[in-house]
Amino acid sequence: MTSSYGHVLERQPALGGRLDSPGNLDTLQAKKNFSVSHLLDLEEAGDMVAAQADENVGEAGRSLLESPGLTSGSDTPQQDNDQLNSEEKKKRKQRRNRTTFNSSQLQALERVFERTHYPDAFVREDLARRVNLTEARVQVWFQNRRAKFRRNERAMLANKNASLLKSYSGDVTAVEQPIVPRPAPRPTDYLSWGTASPYSAMATYSATCANNSPAQGINMANSIANLRLKAKEYSLQRNQVPTVN
């Protein structure tokens, strides 16, 4: 065993000398030149990437160290929370509590609003004392009431315009499509004249004339006889008057 171990130890310097020899170094360099990584320039690219990564890491570290936010580490979250709390407090202070009015207060306010939509300071103060409110609350109520009044007016005007447009459109359609009037009923006289023939009308007219002619002849004869009688009487009266010689 000792002899074999000694033989191995003796061979190690020989191997080291063989690797360090110039011929062996040239062989290793030739193998390295023909390797895949050397042919594809992967070794140089890897070295460049590694160097660039080291530079980026160094710059990032310096920027983080130089930033003012990280210098005060645990102070920034606390400051942000304080700012948020202060803003919320301001909003709560600015927000007013909603006032609820009872029926008597609303009646008094509505009566004044019916008289004037813009009461002056004296009227508002007097009204506030009567309804047990502050003058500012009364002023805000009148502002809201005026806005509501304007909204109602606009809605009523819009409804009125819509109804007018609807009626106008209905009139236009009626003019465009007129209804045919029904024929008026004809009188009975017109129907009798229309149905009777002209010959029948002439016959009736001649019959009436024939019926009236005898009466007219008798009247004329009577008048002639009367004239004759009057003439005879006149002649007789003249003959009876004595003549003076």
From Swiss-Prot:
Pfam family, one: Homeodomain
Localisation: Nucleus
Superkingdom classification of source: Eukaryota
Chief location bin: nucleus
Signal peptide residue numbers: none
SMART domains membership: HOX (SM00389)
InterPro entries cross-referenced by the UniProt entry: HD (IPR001356), Homeobox_CS (IPR017970), Homeodomain-like_sf (IPR009057), OAR_dom (IPR003654), PRRX1/2 (IPR043378)
GO biological process: artery morphogenesis; cartilage development; embryonic cranial skeleton morphogenesis; embryonic limb morphogenesis; inner ear morphogenesis; mesenchymal cell proliferation; middle ear morphogenesis; neuron fate determination
Chain positions found as N6-acetyllysine: K160
Bias (Polar residues): 69-84
GO CC terms, sorted: chromatin; cytosol; nucleoplasm; nucleus
Transmembrane parts of this sequence: none
Record key words, sorted: Acetylation, Developmental protein, Disease variant, DNA-binding, Homeobox, Nucleus, Phosphoprotein
DNA-binding region residue numbers: 94-153
Functional note: Master transcription factor of stromal fibroblasts for myofibroblastic lineage progression. Orchestrates the functional drift of fibroblasts into myofibroblastic phenotype via TGF-beta signaling by remodeling a super-enhancer landscape. Through this function, plays an essential role in wound healing process. Acts as a transcriptional regulator of muscle creatine kinase (MCK) and so has a role in the establishment of diverse mesodermal muscle types. The protein binds to an A/T-rich element in the muscle creatine enhancer.
Associated clinical condition: Agnathia-otocephaly complex: A rare condition characterized by mandibular hypoplasia or agnathia, ventromedial auricular malposition (melotia) and/or auricular fusion (synotia), and microstomia with oroglossal hypoplasia or aglossia. Holoprosencephaly is the most commonly identified association, but skeletal, genitourinary, and cardiovascular anomalies, and situs inversus have been reported. The disorder is almost always lethal.
Record family assignment: Belongs to the paired homeobox family.
Name the UniProt record assigns to this protein: Paired mesoderm homeobox protein 1
